[in-house]
Amino acid sequence: MYVLFEGVDGVGKSTQIEMIARAHEDSLVTKEPGGTKIGQKLREILLGGDFKLSARAEILLFLADRAEHYQKMIKPNSSRLILSDRGFVSGVAYALANDASLKIDDLLWLNSFALEGKFADKIVFFEASETLIKKRLSSRGLIDAIEARGLKYLLKVQECMKEVLKAHKFNVLYIDASEDIATINAKIENFIKF
């Protein structure tokens, strides 16, 4: 089962992925961007801030990573529980936040192409208030190029993520990121039962 953990930075995705992975020893933990060797290089380019890419070039690099990630990580491990920190929802949402002229349907088609039509089996979406995001990001210290765009930008991305999830009949568990870790974990465990 291919499960995406989606939400902006600082909402608790990584914490929950670690907990779920410990409870499911045969699970595969991966991430986008950066889940493959080429993905790690693309991640450096995309998040490092060394290059000023156009919005469309950025989308295409994320799609290249997504296609490679699907071929090397998701497809060959389809019989396992795959826990991915981000995926196509983030890709589409960040693209929409960067360029309002883009259409969700076009971006979903491009992602479907990259994923051979295989979107995630289940999606866990973490939503957080402005106050919570600000608090958690300020406690982390280092900021990547996307986080550096600001809190308002991350809130815009979060709204775009919700639009993406509503645009298609995805199997989604909505999580209030302000809930305690154990409560969130129990909800996710129940959601991903085989």
UniProtKB/Swiss-Prot annotation:
It is an enzyme of class 2 (transferase). It comes from the Bacteria. Pfam families: Thymidylate_kin. Keywords: ATP-binding, Kinase, Nucleotide biosynthesis, Nucleotide-binding, Transferase. Phosphorylation of dTMP to form dTDP in both de novo and salvage pathways of dTTP synthesis. Belongs to the thymidylate kinase family. Its EC number is 2.7.4.9. One of its GO terms (cellular component) is cytosol. HAMAP family: Thymidylate_kinase (MF_00165). This is Thymidylate kinase. It catalyses: dTMP + ATP = dTDP + ADP. SUPFAM superfamilies: P-loop containing nucleoside triphosphate hydrolases. PANTHER family: THYMIDYLATE KINASE, UMP-CMP KINASE 2, MITOCHONDRIAL.
